[in-house]
Amino acid sequence: MKIGVLGVQGDVREHVEALHKLGVETLIVKLPEHLDMVDGLILPGGESTTMIRILKEMNMDEKLVEKINDGLPVFATCAGVILLAKRINNYKQEKLGVLDVTVERNAYGRQVESFETFIEIPAIGKDPFRAIFIRAPRIVETGRSVEILAYHEGDPVLVKEGKILASTFHPELTDDLRLHRYFLEMVK
């Protein structure tokens, strides 16, 4: 199994390190043809407007949508969720539009208002998961086929739709590998 990490901007290194700790071969995806070389893909946190602009400049956006629609498993964190969302409230931004959610960018505040909390994620076990929110998006609406795996103060923060796993927080910034392991099970 080989997992790609989109390498255009953001928390690339942190995801690669998490995957290496799990003994997984990785590829930093920087070219459209790299998408044909991976069994699953992680879209890291970062700055979503920069990421979509770079994807378009590299002509990778259409290929990525095609691969996801063909069943490529994807794990998106923070800005990656914004990239995948079908709808973004109160902000005009291009997106890939493959995940049936509506999001609000930076909904939990600015960088200085970032926070950590523990959340319950029954799908990965009974122990709470340390969730780090940094200028995180808020999922304000989910489509019928979207399964909500975790909440924070009533808002969905971890969702799954088909082969897409989407987290508004940053699991790659913790030592807890359970979400990465959960994603690898989706890829198998």
Curated annotation (Swiss-Prot):
Q: Which InterPro entries match?
A: Class_I_gatase-like, PdxT/SNO, PdxT/SNO_CS
List the pathway annotation: Cofactor biosynthesis; pyridoxal 5'-phosphate biosynthesis
Q: What GO molecular functions are on record for this protein?
A: glutaminase activity; pyridoxal 5'-phosphate synthase (glutamine hydrolysing) activity
Some GO term, biological process aspect, for this entry: which one? pyridoxine metabolic process
EC numbers for this chain = 4.3.3.6, 3.5.1.2
State the UniProt keywords alphabetically. Glutamine amidotransferase, Hydrolase, Lyase, Pyridoxal phosphate
Under Gene3D superfamilies, the record lists:
3.40.50.880
Instruction: Identify the residues that bind L-glutamine.
Output: 46-48, 105, 134-135
Q: NCBIfam families this protein is in?
A: PLP_synth_Pdx2
Q: How does it assemble?
A: In the presence of PdxS, forms a dodecamer of heterodimers. Only shows activity in the heterodimer.
* Protein purpose: Catalyzes the hydrolysis of glutamine to glutamate and ammonia as part of the biosynthesis of pyridoxal 5'-phosphate. The resulting ammonia molecule is channeled to the active site of PdxS.
Write down what this protein is called: Pyridoxal 5'-phosphate synthase subunit PdxT
Q: Please name the source species.
A: Thermotoga neapolitana (strain ATCC 49049 / DSM 4359 / NBRC 107923 / NS-E)
Gene that encodes the chain: pdxT
